Amino acid sequence: DFIMGYKPSGEGFELQNGIFYKFCQKASNNQEVPYFFIIDEINRGNMSKIFGELLMLIEKDYRGKKLTLAYNGLPFSVPKNVYIIGMMNTADRSLALIDYALRRRFSFFAMEPGFSSDGFWQYLDSFNDDTFYALIEKIKDLNFEIAKDPSLGSGFCIGHSYFCGQDECTDEWMQSVVEYDILPMLEEYWFDEPAKIQKWQNILRGVF
């Protein structure tokens, strides 16, 4: 269904264009404009099977070159102005790894927690709350310990989004994030290290 697929139509099935096929057609008709196709949690599916025969066409050296589709016998190409962005959650161990055939067709960029970014510090400064500053520093310390843990790594670090989107900064809100989001996660991370869990419970609760 990603490229093409048979879907119910009346009393039977009809071959219909899939979302990526339609997207490429639209991009092909407007090649002066970049088109970005974003796949969230790309490693939830078997991308080699999903792209199938088109796997070669997403390579930069084959952009614009036509391939006859097995679905309908018609030529198809991936335009040069199509950019495929795949997002992965490397911390979810239940998900499939990206195989090498697909991996070599992509460049990779790690998105680290944005606690040190200019945007987050502007957000932090807008509250001018000493407790909030202190809590974020402790979270950064926590992330350092998570990142160096050989059983976890940087993919398991606490993201800044837990602390974003607030119009008002209160101790009640910060405590709720710690108690109901951060600490339960640490209990999963270090389920066999109760002393480490207790240590970070004391540190984070001690901010208040």
Predicted regions and their residues:
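AAA+ P-loop NTPase catalytic core and its hallmark functional loops
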Residues: 1-152, 168-180, 184-208
